[in-house]
Amino acid sequence: MVINPSTIVSTLSMSIMAILAVSIFFFSKSYFYPPQNNNLVSFRVSNDTLSNNPNGSSLDYNSGPFAISVLKTLAFLSVISLLISVQNSFKSINLTFSLWFNNTPTNVSINFLLDQYFLLFLSVGLIVTWSIMEFSYYYMKEDPNGKAFFRPFGHFSLNMLILTSSNSLFLVFLGWEGVGFLSFLLISWWATRNDASSSALEAVIYNRIGDIGLITFMSLAVLTTNSWNLTEIITNEPNNHFVLFMLFGLILAAAGKSAQFGLHPWLPAAMEGPTPVSALLHSSTMVVAGVFLLVRTSELFSNYPNANTIVLVLGGTTALFAASTAIAQHDIKKIIAYSTTSQLGLMVAAIGIGQPVLAFFHICTHAFFKAMLFLCLGSVIHSLNNERNLRKMEGISDLSPVTSACLAMGSLALMGTPFLAGFYSKDLILEAASASFANTLGISLGIVATMLTTVYSFRIVFFCFSSNNSISPLSPIGEENSNLINALLRLSIGTILSGWFFSNFIFSPPSFTVTPEEKGLPLLVTVVGLTVIFISLSYLSSNPIKSTSHSTTTSQWFFVDIVHSALTTTSFISSSFSSSRTLDRGWQENIGAQGIAQSSTALSKANQASQIGLIKRYIASSIAAITIIATLTFIVLS
């Protein structure tokens, strides 16, 4: 009996998700959370009742090796599923598990779409999550609540897999809200720190704005197409009166979840969470959810060039803003955070020029080297007693050779060095941009941002491999832990091989014609960036910049000052004035008691003015009244 490859792929994929969902409940038997502040920001979900441990004491159970083994097994199964799919030419599989409300006009069902996007993301996501989970066992070992860390971590990955596999708006919304809620829990893991609590709340608020866009899209899609199936919504193009609002909802949703310009401040602030959370958040889960949604629905944009232009300019602006801000930062986690925002902008710009496949290609390659960068940072920060200032990490390569080598490799991949993961996807995006007839401004912004990426990436390498040693001799530096080394080496292999493997066996490069000059554009951009950083490092060491442009980039284009301070203060004052004018001086004064008193006084004064005691005015008014009455009577009788 011959087994259909599609059956094997679908069985493996659904089994992986089912095993992950069930095994998460065994990732931790410790539900004790340390005392938290009594406020909404530091709210935590407690599972003491589920653990049958009313005293909240930590149970003597270590779930780290079990969680790592589960993720390792599932990662290997996902790779097998991916290889079978490659041999089967990535035939899309649409699974419908059950139908709800069959007697209703709207087709509400649970659908999964196992296509090229999901099957590749399944492998990439599980490999990256496995590596980060293994690193977490080393990093969170001293945390008093570290045993409970693996459960929300696993739930985070599961919700992202639900989001990427779902073909039903119901499941899309479930996964979308799941990663949002769990990001709040993980960012505020150290909730006794005010910065962590406020950062988690900031992430929720900005993502709520994006959720408005997704709900708008879902509502109008169901209203116009009478279906919850995403494929049917895209195939049966909605009514033209609503499609523009649907596209606006998609753009707003992607901007909120993927931290595009205007809704970006939450992403750098999320660095207050544990480093494994930052690694998972920035590499293969929440921040790429918005981009993935645009990739899934990119066909809706094909007939609306203005919408594509908005997406392109938004992505280019985000990439330029984040890259220009990163070059002026000294907090190494903030530098990598802004680099994530810049790369997300590049992905969105790729969708804007009509290349969603290239955007997804960059999602997959970016996941490996960005996760590796964060794990390297976590190792360095952990060894330097939570020191995050890049200028105080000079000479770290002599003390941590493996970590420094992986950090340099990740930075080189980020800047697009040939034959590393980032080169293959960024090269194709820049070539496609130069060959497209899309908005020139958006393309130019993306190219300049790519050049600046080289600047801040090489800046990290320069300080880490500097001959000067600014590290405290008391820092407990060491690389003896196998969980750290194995995770870094695994991701480094992905950084080296993933771009080549994906470009040759997974993705079919888009067909477009470029001139030799345009073909050399990516390499030229990298060379220009290296030239800029060399000149800057040689000149700025003795001539520090004190200019408006430097202040602008250091202060994030004054965005936070304007939006969080000026606009907030202005809106508060105007709303206070309006409410005071409407309520205190409105209903309660002008229209209320004082208004009645003023009206009565005015009527009384008018009545008094008419009764001044002059006989001639009384006689004149009587004659006028008699004349008017007589005239009207004559007119009526005649």
Curated annotation (Swiss-Prot):
Its EC number is 7.1.1.2. It catalyses: a ubiquinone + NADH + 5 H(+)(in) = a ubiquinol + NAD(+) + 4 H(+)(out). The keyword Membrane applies. Keywords: Electron transport, Membrane, Mitochondrion, Mitochondrion inner membrane, NAD, Respiratory chain, Translocase, Transmembrane, Transmembrane helix, Transport, Ubiquinone. InterPro entries: NADH_DH_su5_C, NADHpl_OxRdtase_5_subgr, ND/Mrp_TM, NU5C-like, Proton_antipo_N. It is found in: Mitochondrion inner membrane. Pfam families: NADH5_C, Proton_antipo_M, Proton_antipo_N. Core subunit of the mitochondrial membrane respiratory chain NADH dehydrogenase (Complex I) that is believed to belong to the minimal assembly required for catalysis. Complex I functions in the transfer of electrons from NADH to the respiratory chain. The immediate electron acceptor for the enzyme is believed to be ubiquinone. Signal peptide: none annotated. The gene is ND5. GO terms for molecular function: NADH dehydrogenase (ubiquinone) activity. Its main location: mitochondrion. The keyword Lipid biosynthesis does not apply. It is a multi-pass membrane protein. It comes from Paracentrotus lividus. GO terms for biological process: ATP synthesis coupled electron transport; electron transport coupled proton transport. The chain crosses the membrane at residues 7-27, 66-86, 112-132, 169-189, 203-223, 242-262, 275-295, 307-327, 335-354, 365-385, 404-424, 445-465, 487-507, 520-540, 618-638. Belongs to the complex I subunit 5 family. NCBIfam families: NDH_I_L. GO terms for cellular component: mitochondrial inner membrane. This is NADH-ubiquinone oxidoreductase chain 5. PANTHER family: NADH-UBIQUINONE OXIDOREDUCTASE CHAIN 5.
